[in-house]
Amino acid sequence: MNLEYVHVVQKFNQVLLELTKKVCTVVGGSKPTYWYHHIRRVCSECPSMPMTMIGPYLNVYKTQILTKDKNFFMNFDPAHNEYTFIIQKLKEAARNMSEEELEQYWVKLLFLLKSYIKCKPFIN
């Protein structure tokens, strides 16, 4: 197995777990592993997309989180229903997060996701 891939996945999982714990704490959830499972599942679907789509696709959600648009989920039908579920929880958490804090998590996740996708073709 490609060591770079392993390293990226470990970092990716670590950041996801941090974000998951944050969401659980803010939203009032008591099972970080439950959220982690769902978020990880969503992210595992992304590598099937072309690299050029990842950033724009996720940035749509980032924009809605930061603007806290309550009508977003009534007016937008995402490609993956799992995203609606996860991003709704991130929106709830975002109400109590500073934009700077949320941005920091988002940048990490987007960077690691792109790295993960870039490494994945080398794995058999």
Swiss-Prot record:
Main subcellular location: virion
Keyword annotations from UniProtKB, A to Z: Late protein, Virion
Top-level division of the source organism's lineage: Viruses
Gene Ontology CC annotation, any one: virion component
Inducers of expression: Expressed in the late phase of the viral replicative cycle.
Subcellular location(s) per record: Virion
UniProt record similarity statement: Belongs to the asfivirus H124R family.
Protein name (database record): Uncharacterized protein H124R
Organism listed in the record: African swine fever virus (isolate Tick/Malawi/Lil 20-1/1983) (ASFV)
Source species taxonomy: Viruses, Varidnaviria, Bamfordvirae, Nucleocytoviricota, Pokkesviricetes
